[in-house]
Design a protein with these regions (language model features):
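Ligand-binding pocket segment of bilobal, Venus flytrap-like solute-binding proteins
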Residues: 13-94
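Extracytoplasmic/periplasmic, Sec-exported soluble proteins
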Residues: 18-22, 45, 60, 64, ...
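Acidic, amphipathic alpha-helical patches
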Residues: 68, 102, 162
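Periplasmic-binding protein-like
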Residues: 81-117, 147, 154-155
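Residue-level detector of anion-binding/catalytic polar loops
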Residues: 37-39, 59, 103, 150, ...
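Hinge/capping helix and adjacent helix->loop/strand transition within the periplasmic-binding protein
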Residues: 1-48, 97-99, 110-143
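Short, structured secondary-structure boundary patches
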Residues: 60-64, 83, 104, 127, ...
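An extracytoplasmic/periplasmic, membrane-proximal ligand-sensing/linker region
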Residues: 73, 99, 121-184
Length: 184
């Protein structure tokens, strides 16, 4: 909340690091939701961006939790918000963006398991069953948690669930990406 107030009082002065189109999209959405403006600073990756954040050269940074988790856990980097709609079980002490004063700023990284078009439905079902079984393994879930990754809800662990999630993400982000002229 204090950061947004500072951004409003100092338009265009906050440096916002983005190392990919998703980060820039989050910055555009942040501006839209808060009525602020930022100076986008492109980086070639999360590592250099985090280093410059730690050194105080930039003001705002959006990265996957896995990239910043070691610094957050060590106390050298402050995580202002988790951009998921709900608190992450991996980092429950980090507030959501809604709780931090920017309702609706939701951007989550995710992974999907894909097969070539035309793959038989039986093969897809077998692959999906193996993936669901693997994701139920407590050891694998712990490894994901150690990396800062949440496992998708069971309803998203199906081809239909992934398709619905993907459609919702496209419907949400495409207008923002198009309006801002963001390129990959």
């Amino acid at each position: 909340k204090g950061l947004v107030a500072w951004m409003k009082a100092n338009p265009g002065k906050a440096t916002f690091v983005n190392q990919n189109a998703a980060g820039q999209t989050a910055g555009v959405m942040l501006q839209q939701l808060t009525g602020t403006s930022v100076l986008f600073v492109p980086y070639k990756g999360a590592g250099p961006a985090i280093q410059d954040m730690l050194a105080g050269h930039v003001d705002l940074l959006v990265v996957q939790a896995a990239a910043a988790l070691p610094q957050v856990r060590a106390g050298t980097l402050k995580a202002s918000a988790n951009m998921s709609p709900a608190r992450s079980p991996v980092v429950p002490g980090i507030p959501t963006s809604d709780e931090a004063g920017v309702p609706g700023l939701h951007l989550t990284g995710w992974f999907g398991l894909w097969a070539p078009k035309g793959t038989p439905k039986e093969a897809i079902a077998k692959l999906n069953a193996a993936m669901v079984a693997a994701l139920a393994d407590p050891g694998l879930r712990q490894k994901f948690s150690d990396l800062g990754l949440d496992v998708a809800s069971r309803d998203q662990q199906t081809p239909e669930g992934l398709a619905a999630f993907l459609k919702a993400e496209i419907d949400k982000w495409w207008p923002i990406i198009k309006a801002a002229g963001i390129k990959a």
